[in-house]
């Protein structure tokens, strides 16, 4: 039990970059993904109309970087602010656009991110 507490304390004390590296290593070693699974809506018979209304009221959004724009440096800076990625990871994300920046976030957070990239890069919210 004390070993678990020590492990928890060590994990909590990691920097964000170290924690991200730990997650990647665990994903590779265990063959899993830390990304949240997308919710699945199954509609059947009379419940179909209710399910369609629920789908129309989306609560989780994905912010996608569609195009880095003319000034990649400013885009990389904005990506780092929004995602807390390191410089190399942010550059790779910008160079590989279109790619998701943030997934499963609220509409307010998605709009705030879109405002941050206004005039810097092309952002799409899904």
UniProtKB/Swiss-Prot annotation:
A single Gene Ontology CC term: cytoplasm
List the keywords (alphabetical).
Ribonucleoprotein, Ribosomal protein
What the entry lists under Gene3D superfamilies is as follows: 3.30.1390.10, Single helix bin
The processes (GO biological process) annotated in the record are:
translation
- Give the Gene Ontology MF terms in alphabetical order: mRNA binding; structural constituent of ribosome
Q: Which domain of life is it from?
A: Bacteria
Query: Signal peptide span per the entry?
Result: none
One Pfam entry name: Ribosomal_L12
Whether Ribonucleoprotein counts among this entry's keywords is yes
Q: Which HAMAP family match?
A: Ribosomal_bL12
PANTHER family named among the record's database cross-references: 39S RIBOSOMAL PROTEIN L12, LARGE RIBOSOMAL SUBUNIT PROTEIN BL12M
Q: What subunit structure does UniProt give?
A: Homodimer. Part of the ribosomal stalk of the 50S ribosomal subunit. Forms a multimeric L10(L12)X complex, where L10 forms an elongated spine to which 2 to 4 L12 dimers bind in a sequential fashion. Binds GTP-bound translation factors.
Protein family (similarity comment): Belongs to the bacterial ribosomal protein bL12 family.
Protein name in the entry: Large ribosomal subunit protein bL12
The species this protein belongs to is Acidobacterium capsulatum (strain ATCC 51196 / DSM 11244 / BCRC 80197 / JCM 7670 / NBRC 15755 / NCIMB 13165 / 161)
Query: What is this organism's lineage?
Result: Bacteria, Pseudomonadati, Acidobacteriota, Terriglobia, Terriglobales
Name the gene that codes for it: rplL
